[in-house]
A protein has these predicted regions:
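Extreme N-terminal starter segment of soluble prokaryotic enzymes
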Residues: 4-10
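Phosphate-coordination loops involved in phosphoryl transfer and adenosine-cofactor binding
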Residues: 6, 67, 154
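Active-site and donor-binding regions of nucleotide-sugar-utilizing enzymes
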Residues: 11-131
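Short hydrophobic segments within beta-strands
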Residues: 12, 97, 160-162, 195
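A nucleotide-sugar donor-handling region in carbohydrate enzymes
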Residues: 105-173
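Short hydrophobic signal-anchor/transmembrane segments that target glycosyltransferases
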Residues: 174-189
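Catalytic donor nucleotide-activated moiety binding site of glycosyltransferases and closely related
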Residues: 189-212
Length: 212
């Protein structure tokens, strides 16, 4: 039980699975009763986000009674969160997950992982982004037999490989360094559990595969 158990919430997202997992994880951890508010701006509104206007159909989906909490995540979700913040006022505590790339005034609280550079009086940081894996869930997963993983020798190393994004690009040197590190650990007796992203460059995936 948390002090917010049973409070109402709207989760405002762009529909991306990674964004929704973060918003849902926070809502569940707080014990909120939540509803989804997905936005999909098009044309100029999408290009201007997070600075542009709220979606044209905002008034159809964002109407009183206002929720106790609103959690927004994703660049294109920020205009809707900003407008809700202004309309609901003190009735709704607003939270922006990840760097909203706009004014601190967009929400009551901005929550970013430490690797983001965003800092401010209403900004909090955690080592990583929020997620849905609670201690209870992790304990259950550890205790659940898994034939493939259980056969791997220890130590076991999890390698989660992302990909190129607007703020960062995988270089050939990055791929070589990652592959070299995996090869070195493998020579020391480690086994690996590797997952890639849809944005992982093929050259990186190939380099890692060859190093295993």
């Amino acid at each position: 039980m948390t002090p917010l158990n049973g409070a109402t919430a709207w989760l405002i997202t762009d529909g991306k699975a990674g964004h929704e997992a973060q918003a849902q994880g926070v809502a569940e951890a707080l014990g909120l009763t939540y509803e989804w508010r997905r936005v999909a701006p098009v044309g100029l509104a999408r290009m201007l986000a997070p600075w542009g206007p709220a979606p044209a159909n905002f008034d159809q989906h964002f109407t009183p009674p206002w929720p106790d909490v609103a959690i927004g995540i994703g660049r294109t979700a920020m205009p809707a969160l900003r407008r809700l913040h202004r309309l609901a006022g003190l009735a709704t505590f607003t939270i922006a997950l990840q760097d909203p790339r706009t004014s601190d005034r967009i929400a009551d609280l901005i929550w970013v992982p430490e690797h983001d550079q965003r800092r401010g009086p209403n900004v909090i940081t955690t080592l990583i982004a929020p997620h849905r894996f609670t201690p209870v869930m992790l304990k259950a997963l550890r205790e659940e037999p898994h034939a493939v993983i259980d056969e791997l020798p220890t130590p076991r190393v999890m390698v989660a490989i992302g990909g190129t994004a607007k703020a960062w690009r995988f270089t050939d040197d990055d791929a070589h360094q990652l592959a070299a590190a995996i090869e070195t650990m493998g020579q020391d007796g480690a086994s690996f559990m590797v997952t890639t992203s849809r944005r992982t460059p093929p050259a990186v995936a190939t380099a890692v595969s060859q190093a295993l």
